[in-house]
């Protein structure tokens, strides 16, 4: 099925160029031509889903997109992109999505989809018209670099949400690019995205704190990464293999108050910017240790007092 299977809609609001792509897939257009849209356009086209058009106000981004996706054309405006496509992907910053939705003019049988991880499809309601559908398609991928993002999309998780028929189509699209679709309720997207920010950006913030503290031990950034990244990988592997609780090791499992006191003193002197982060993660680790039965509440109490903000 395709989004263009629906006909009718408001009088005088029929698609001016009915679909004729031999693949049977809806023709895709992008609003925005940044890293996300370029990577998605490349993998969609490789998977046999036709990418027909892009609308962007940035001429350099437009040129890059058209170079990456031969056969696509530049639409003169956001409102005009629907004239040549069936499925519009809105790949702009979250705060701009509602404004774009208000500008889109969808025809019956078309759909609009955004790629925000935090917002539900309801932000696209201004674009909805009779016989149209809205949804969201969020790949769990870091789009820092084009080639790496394209490679990472194969095997990635893609959160899909929105109108029933469209969600089925988006799930098929995700599968066709080698990704794993996961359906989310609209109310769950903010928590899902916050977890993604912790998993992706949070680990970088943690590494920055690690590097700051390691400088106190005479290590530069490269030296710190060489030592601590393998430890992080081991911890992640353990969590995946035996579960989060069982993967925890260190002074909080053992109840080593003296060790933690020494850490806090060193942080205060050498890396005060990382002190708050250490306390926050330490409190979480201590709770895991108690939950796991390594410490009881009486044993954990001295550590909790030590970790209180001051």
Please identify what each model-predicted range represents.
Residues 62-68, 127, 148-241:
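Internal alpha-helical scaffold of NAD(P)-dependent oxidoreductase catalytic cores
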Residues 29-30, 90, 160:
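Hydrophobic Val/Ile/Leu positions in short beta-strands of Rossmann-like dinucleotide-binding domains
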Residues 24-27, 109, 155:
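Phosphate-coordination loops involved in phosphoryl transfer and adenosine-cofactor binding
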Residues 237-299:
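Interdomain hinge/lid region at the active-site interface
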Residues 2-76, 80:
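NAD(P)+-binding Rossmann beta1-loop-alpha1 motif at the extreme N-terminus of oxidoreductases
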Residues 59, 69-148:
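Rossmann-like NAD(P)(H) cofactor-binding subdomain of soluble oxidoreductases
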Residues 49-50, 132, 179, 219:
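Short phosphate-binding/catalytic loops that engage adenosine nucleotides
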Residues 1-18, 275-279, 284-310:
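SAM-dependent methyltransferases
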């Amino acid at each position: 099925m395709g989004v263009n299977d629906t006909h009718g809609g408001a009088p005088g609001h029929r698609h001016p160029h009915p679909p004729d792509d031999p693949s049977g897939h809806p023709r895709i257009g992008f609003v925005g031509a940044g890293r996300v849209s370029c990577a998605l356009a490349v993998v969609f086209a490789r998977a046999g889903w036709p990418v027909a058009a892009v609308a962007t106000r940035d001429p350099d981004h437009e040129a890059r997109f058209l170079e990456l996706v031969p056969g696509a054309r530049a639409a003169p405006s956001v409102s005009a992109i629907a004239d040549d496509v069936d499925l519009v992907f809105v790949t702009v910053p979250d705060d701009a999505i509602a404004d774009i939705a208000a500008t889109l003019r969808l025809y019956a049988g078309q759909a609009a989809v955004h790629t925000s991880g935090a917002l539900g499809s309801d932000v696209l309601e201004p674009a909805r018209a009779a016989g149209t559908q809205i949804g969201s398609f969020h790949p769990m991928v870091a789009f820092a670099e084009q080639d790496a993002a394209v490679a990472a999309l194969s095997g990635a998780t893609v959160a899909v949400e929105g109108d029933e028929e469209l969600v089925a189509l988006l799930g098929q699209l995700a599968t066709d690019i080698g990704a794993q679709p996961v359906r989310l309720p609209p109310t769950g997207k903010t928590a899902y995205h916050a977890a993604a920010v912790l998993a992706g950006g949070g680990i970088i913030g943690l590494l920055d704190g690690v590097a700051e503290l390691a400088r106190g031990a005479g290590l530069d950034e490269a030296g710190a990464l060489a030592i601590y990244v393998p430890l992080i990988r081991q911890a992640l592997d353990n969590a995946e293999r035996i579960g989060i609780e069982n993967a925890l090791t260190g002074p909080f499992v053992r109840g080593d108050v003296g060790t933690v006191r020494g850490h806090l003193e060193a942080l205060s002197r050498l890396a005060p910017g990382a002190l708050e982060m250490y306390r926050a993660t330490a409190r979480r680790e201590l709770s895991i240790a108690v939950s796991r039965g390594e410490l009881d509440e009486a044993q954990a109490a001295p550590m909790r007092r030590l970790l209180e903000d001051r």
